[in-house]
Amino acid sequence: MFSIRISTVVLAASALLAVAIPMTNTETPQCNTGPIQCCNSVQSATSSAAAGPLAALGVLSGIASLLGEVGLDCSPLQVIGVGANSCSSQAACCTGNTFNGAVVLGCSPIKLL
């Protein structure tokens, strides 16, 4: 009878320990639409910060409201090797066109782990 109680206590303690151990996520964030971009900022296309670069590309202000968020001054983020997953500004997943990295359309900010 005593051994059954000991077994039950040990089993319960093991289950609690397994639940209490934190799990770490070591997966690299990924972007299904292309490379992760490291941008100086991600702004609404209608913001004053994006107005200048978009105007330089010939995007009319009325059309800017259709673009959503844009990445400004972006470069592809390396996920392998030296400096992997390091972006000192804003990492973003972008679905639209890239204009020499100055402006990237259709961006959403992401958090690097």
Swiss-Prot record:
Protein task: Aerial growth, conidiation, and dispersal of filamentous fungi in the environment rely upon a capability of their secreting small amphipathic proteins called hydrophobins (HPBs) with low sequence identity. Class I can self-assemble into an outermost layer of rodlet bundles on aerial cell surfaces, conferring cellular hydrophobicity that supports fungal growth, development and dispersal; whereas Class II form highly ordered films at water-air interfaces through intermolecular interactions but contribute nothing to the rodlet structure.
Top-level taxon in the UniProt lineage: Eukaryota
Disulphides: C31-C93, C38-C87, C39-C74, C94-C107
SMART domains with a match to the protein in the record: HYDRO (SM00075)
Induction: Expression is induced by natural light and low temperature.
Tissue: Expressed in the fruiting bodies but not in vegetative mycelium.
Location relative to the cell: Secreted; Secreted, Cell wall
GO molecular function: structural constituent of cell wall
Segments crossing the lipid bilayer: none
Family the UniProt entry places it in: Belongs to the fungal hydrophobin family.
InterPro entries with a match to the protein in the record: Hydrophobin (IPR001338)
Signal peptide feature range: 1-26
SUBUNIT field: Self-assembles to form functional amyloid fibrils called rodlets. Self-assembly into fibrillar rodlets occurs spontaneously at hydrophobic:hydrophilic interfaces and the rodlets further associate laterally to form amphipathic monolayers.
GO cellular component assignments: extracellular region; fungal-type cell wall
Stretches of the chain forming a coiled coil according to its record: none
Natural source organism: Pleurotus ostreatus (Oyster mushroom)
Keywords from the named record: Cell wall, Disulfide bond, Secreted, Signal
Protein name (Swiss-Prot/TrEMBL): Class I hydrophobin POH1
